[in-house]
Amino acid sequence: MAAETFLFTSESVNEGHPDKLCDQVSDAVLDACLAQDADSKVACETVTKTNMVMVLGEITTKATVDYEKIVRDTCRNIGFISDDVGLDADRCKVLVNIEQQSPDIAQGVHGHFTKRPEEVGAGDQGIMFGYATDETPELMPLSHVLATKLGARLTEVRKNGTCAWVRPDGKTQVTVEYLNEDGAMVPVRVHTVLISTQHDETVTNDEIAADLKEHVIKPVIPAKYLDENTIFHLNPSGRFVIGGPHGDAGLTGRKIIIDTYGGWGAHGGGAFSGKDPTKVDRSGAYIARQAAKSIIASGLARRCIVQISYAIGVPEPLSVFVDSYGTGKIPDREILKLVKENFDFRPGMISINLDLKKGGNRFIKTAAYGHFGRDDADFTWEVVKPLKFDKASA
C-alpha cells in the first residue's frame, strides 16, 4: 500500500501589501534610530489607509530622525508613486505620534541604561518559538519557501520591467503534498499554486495567467514538484486593480506567520517589526531559530521546535523546551542540554552575539519576504552553531 500523504498550505504577501508596507516603515524607523544610536529603545507601529500613513509608538533615542522622510522614502521604494497604484508617497498625509519609552519599563529592563549586557532584563513577558526542518537547503518548510519566493519574484518582474503591468500589492499561496517519514516532512509535489497580483487596467486575465506561469512560477518552483495535476489559481477573483492602502487598511505586525514559518511549528504571537532587540518578541524568536537550525544542521534531528519564555525585567529565560518530533538521533533531553550549553538566551547577550544593535538598512530587509531562511550576512541568526554530541551515545 502506498504511504499516506497529506496537504499543507502556506501563504505570503508582497512588499506592496498594506500590512507589509507598515512592517517596512516600522523597521525603517528602527534602522534609522540604531544607525545613530545603538542603544535606541524602539517600539514603532505604523498604520495606513487611503492617502495616509501614520507612525506611532514609544522611542527613546539620541538619534535625530526625520520620520516623515522615512515614511515617504519607504513607500516610494516599494513602488507607491501615484494614487492609481494605491498610494502616492510624495503627496499622502504623514502623521506622527511618538513618545518616549515609559520610565517604569526603562528602570525594570535596562535600569535607565545602567545595567551591563548580561544584566539587561527582557523587555516584556512572552513566549517565542524557533523551528527548522531538513526538507529544504534553507532548513525551512517548502510550502513557506515557495510562497515567499513567488512573492519576491513577483516584485522582481514588476521592478525590472519584465511584467510592467504588475502593481505593488499581491499575495501568493502554495499547497504542498507531504509524506510524514517518522516525524520528518518529505515534500512529494506541489498540489496548488495561487497568485493574486494587483495589475493595471491594460492587461487581460489571459495575459496575466500566461505571464505569471512563464516569468514567476517557472523560475521559482523546481520542475520536479510540478506535474499535470498541479492546480493553478492565477488572479481567481478576475480583477485586482485597486490595491495597496487604497484597497485595504494596513497595520504593523499583522503578518506574523508569513514572517516566520508559514503555519508550521508554532508562534508565540509577538510581532517583530519596529522593535529593538531588548524586545524579546524579536530577539528571542531569532535566537530560537538559530538554535533550531543548528540542531538540524548538526545532524541531531530532521525536524525540531524550540520554545523559550521570559518575564519582564528578568534576564534568564523562565523555560527552554525542545521537541524533535521523534526525529532526534539522541533523546530530546540531551538536545536540550546541548542547546542550553551553547546558546545564551539573556536578551542583552542575544543583542551582542547576533549583533542586533546594528541599523542602516538591516531590519527593513527582514520586513518583507520572511525573517528566516534568508541567505544574507545581516541575518546573523541564520548562522549555524555546530553542536557537538557524543557519537557513542547516539
UniProtKB/Swiss-Prot annotation:
Pathway noted in the entry: Amino-acid biosynthesis; S-adenosyl-L-methionine biosynthesis; S-adenosyl-L-methionine from L-methionine: step 1/1
Keywords: ATP-binding, Cobalt, Cytoplasm, Magnesium, Metal-binding, Nucleotide-binding, One-carbon metabolism, Potassium, Transferase
Main location: cytoplasm
Gene3D superfamilies in the record: 3.30.300.10
Residues that, per the record, bind Mg(2+): E11
GO molecular function: ATP binding; metal ion binding; methionine adenosyltransferase activity
Subunit structure: Homotetramer.
HAMAP family: S_AdoMet_synth1
Family that this chain belongs to: Belongs to the AdoMet synthase family.
Protein name per Swiss-Prot or TrEMBL: S-adenosylmethionine synthase 3
Organism from which the protein derives: Hordeum vulgare (Barley)
